[in-house]
Amino acid sequence: MYLHLLKSKIHNAIVTSGDLEYEGSITIDSELLDLAGMIPNEKVLVVNNNNGERFETYIIKGDHGSREIQLNGAAARCALPGDEIIIMTFAVMEEAEARNYKPMVLIVDRHNNPKSRHLVGEQSEPLSN
């Protein structure tokens, strides 16, 4: 049996901008992608902590160090600049692997600076800006 598990997440990111005219996606600072273990074109589930909305899209790599979290296309209607969101990726794995798998969690501050990261169930690793 195959299970869908949380692979990684960027927790409490702040939307910096939106572009309704873009063809779709979420643009994320490449440094944040690397720290969270996410890659361009990966499918994401996004939760808006301000209004409860959930939506799926895919990742576009943003400039390293830009702290950009931009919603593009229709996704720009799901959250406004300043809204707090959680960005999650998932993986499909067999039950035996899933039992020991630990997702990566990247915590960011109100300016999308990386604060800490940890594998679920393990101690947090502080990150300097």
UniProtKB/Swiss-Prot annotation:
Q: What is its main location?
A: cytoplasm
Q: What class of enzyme is it?
A: lyase
Q: In which pathway does it act?
A: Cofactor biosynthesis; (R)-pantothenate biosynthesis; beta-alanine from L-aspartate: step 1/1
Q: Which InterPro entries match?
A: Asp_de-COase-like_dom_sf, Asp_decarbox
Provide the catalytic activity annotation: L-aspartate + H(+) = beta-alanine + CO2
Name the chain's protein.
Aspartate 1-decarboxylase
Q: Which GO terms describe its molecular function?
A: aspartate 1-decarboxylase activity
Q: Where does substrate bind?
A: T57, G73, A74, A75
Q: What does this protein do?
A: Catalyzes the pyruvoyl-dependent decarboxylation of aspartate to produce beta-alanine.
Q: Which domain of life is it from?
A: Bacteria
- Where are the bilayer-spanning segments? none
Q: Which UniProt keywords apply?
A: Autocatalytic cleavage, Cytoplasm, Decarboxylase, Lyase, Pantothenate biosynthesis, Pyruvate, Schiff base, Zymogen
UniProt source species: Chlorobium chlorochromatii (strain CaD3)
> Which coenzyme or cofactor does it need?
pyruvate
